[in-house]
Swiss-Prot record:
Protein's GO biological process: protein quality control for misfolded or incompletely synthesized proteins
Claim: S-adenosyl-L-methionine is one of the keywords in the record: no
CDD domains the UniProt entry points to: S14_ClpP_2
Protein name, per record: ATP-dependent Clp protease proteolytic subunit
The protein's assembly and partners: Fourteen ClpP subunits assemble into 2 heptameric rings which stack back to back to give a disk-like structure with a central cavity, resembling the structure of eukaryotic proteasomes.
One Pfam family recorded for the sequence: CLP_protease
PANTHER family: ATP-DEPENDENT CLP PROTEASE PROTEOLYTIC SUBUNIT
InterPro entries for this protein: ClpP (IPR001907), ClpP/crotonase-like_dom_sf (IPR029045), ClpP/TepA (IPR023562), ClpP_His_AS (IPR033135), ClpP_Ser_AS (IPR018215)
Protein's UniProt keywords contain Mitochondrion: no
Amino acid sequence: MIPVVIEQTSRGERSYDIYSRLLKDRIIMLTGPVEDNMANSVIAQLLFLDAQDSTKDIYLYVNTPGGSVSAGLAIVDTMNFIKSDVQTIVMGMAASMGTIIASSGAKGKRFMLPNAEYMIHQPMGGTGGGTQQTDMAIAAEHLLKTRKTLEQILADNSGKTVEQIHADAERDYWMSAEETLAYGFIDEIMANNNLS
């Protein structure tokens, strides 16, 4: 069930679902697994808010275990494509593809709540059972290319070398807010809502 908010206007009462009300304040919620439908919704909201006023920041709240690389990269590409700065605020966790999205916010405007967590790792992939050897080789080559792309994005977003990212992402690498700040993925840990 989605909560409803009621506002008093000069013309009477108006009710909004909570997400529509947040959108009025340029807030987008990216929660749950990153998949095509969720990504399409986030992308549509980014494009709408940018078209509405590209001089104002957009606030993207992130709480995701990660998910689809292609869906996540579509969000990142849109964040980079639009003129509005996208502030990212990690709450709960940003893991896997979530770290790529959250760290791709506008430099100087990437935030994290004190008890949130970050996790990087290498991308996962596979081919179902009964797959031909040639298809397995193609899938493995694609996975290696994907890993290089993601490692380059994380290196660009953190200031670390690709080699450092590669080594740290070999297995699940969890970080607290303080560790994430020291690593360079965020710019500030927020104790209260001081976004402007």
